[in-house]
C-alpha cells in the first residue's frame, strides 16, 4: 500500500480543525472522502491517529497522531518550499530586498546598471526585509545589522563592515579631536536617522551605557538633510561610513574610542536550501567586489 500525499494534507488539516465537517468544507470535498483518507493512513501506519466520539467527531489526537501531525507539517512545508524554489529558478528576474541606505551605496559603486534590469528591487528596513525573506515572499535580501546575523533557515554572507563615526561641522569645538568617547558627547544635541534605522540602534546601544543621558533633538529619515543641519552646526550626528561617501563639505568625521566603536555589518541572505539561478550567482559576485 502506497502513501497518498493528499491523504496527508487532509489529515494535517484535520489535526488543526478537529472536525471532519470543517475539513470537508475547507477542501470542498465530501465528509466520507476525509474519513476514508484517515482510515487509509491508519491502515498504513497500523495505529489510531485520533480518539473519536460516537458521532464521529474528532476529540483529540492520539500520541501517534501528534507525532504524524508534527512530521506532516515538516513534509508539507518542505514540499511547499521546493515548489516555490523551482518556480523561482524558472523566473528571469528575482526579488531582492534592499534597505535604502545599502542600495544607495551599492548603486553609487556601479559603472553599469544594466544588470539591475534582472532585479525586482523590494525596498524596506532590514527587519522588515528579513521577515519577508523568512516567509519566502522575496528570494534574497541585503541586510544591515550591528553584528553578524545567524539563522538556521538562511545562508548569510557578510559582505563588508563600515565603522560608525561622530559627524559634526568643521567649526565645532570638538572637530579637531582624533577620537572621542560617547561620554564626551552627552552635552551635545544629536540629529539622528529614525528609530527604524540601524543607525538609531547603534546610538541607543551607546546611550544605554550612560542611562539614556544623551540629548536627541531631531530624528529624520533623510541623511542628506541631517548632514545639512549638522553642517550649520545645529547638532551632531552618528553615521556609518557607508553614508559618508559624498556631500561631506565642511563636515568632519571623528572616530570613537576603542571601547565605544560600533560597526555596520552589510550582509546578503537567501534560503539555505535554495538553488541560486545564474542571475543570482552573478549578483552575489558583484556584491562580493564591494567594500
Curated annotation (Swiss-Prot):
DNA-binding region: 20-39
Domain of life: Bacteria
Keyword Transport part of the UniProt annotation: no
Signal peptide residue numbers: none
Residues annotated as domain HTH lysR-type: 1-60
Main location: cytoplasm
Listed name of the protein: Malolactic fermentation system transcriptional activator
Subcellular location: Cytoplasm
Stretches that traverse the bilayer: none
One GO cellular component term: cytosol
Xref: Pfam families: HTH_1, LysR_substrate
Family under the similarity heading: Belongs to the LysR transcriptional regulatory family.
A molecular function GO annotation: DNA-binding transcription factor activity
Keywords: Activator, Cytoplasm, DNA-binding, Transcription, Transcription regulation
Keyword Transcription regulation: yes
Biological role: Required for malolactic fermentation. It is most probably a transcriptional activator.
PROSITE patterns: HTH_LYSR (PS50931)
